[in-house]
């Protein structure tokens, strides 16, 4: 089996904050439930967890965070994801 110290778990983006999702609070609630479970699991098992959901929840206010399909994160959103994930990945790869 692999070494869990090399794993980074990323939260689920919230597509309710896109034109496709139309602010559906039920979707956000389910995503919060799953992300809380994943974060808790990671904390209990010493696995790195990165929250990117808050970035995607700005999608209805900042439409530049949503791709032209009205559903997926844009390249700008992904650049913010990378800002959070890359330093952790570099650290893990350098160990």
Q: Language model features by range: what are they?
A:
Residues 1-6:
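A short helix->loop->beta-strand "cap" motif at the edges of active sites that frequently abuts
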Residues 10-11:
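Alpha/beta-hydrolase-fold catalytic nucleophile elbow
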Residues 14-95:
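Catalytic His-Asp segment of secreted/periplasmic serine-dependent ester chemistry enzymes
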């Amino acid at each position: 089996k692999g070494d869990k110290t090399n794993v980074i778990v990323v939260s689920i983006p919230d597509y309710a904050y896109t034109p496709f999702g139309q602010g559906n609070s039920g979707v956000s609630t389910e995503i919060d439930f799953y992300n809380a479970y994943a974060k808790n699991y990671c904390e209990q098992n010493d696995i790195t967890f990165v929250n990117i959901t808050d970035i995607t929840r700005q999608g209805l206010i900042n439409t530049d965070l949503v791709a032209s399909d009205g559903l997926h994160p844009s390249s700008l959103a992904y650049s913010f994801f990378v800002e959070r994930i890359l330093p952790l990945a570099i650290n893990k790869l350098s160990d």
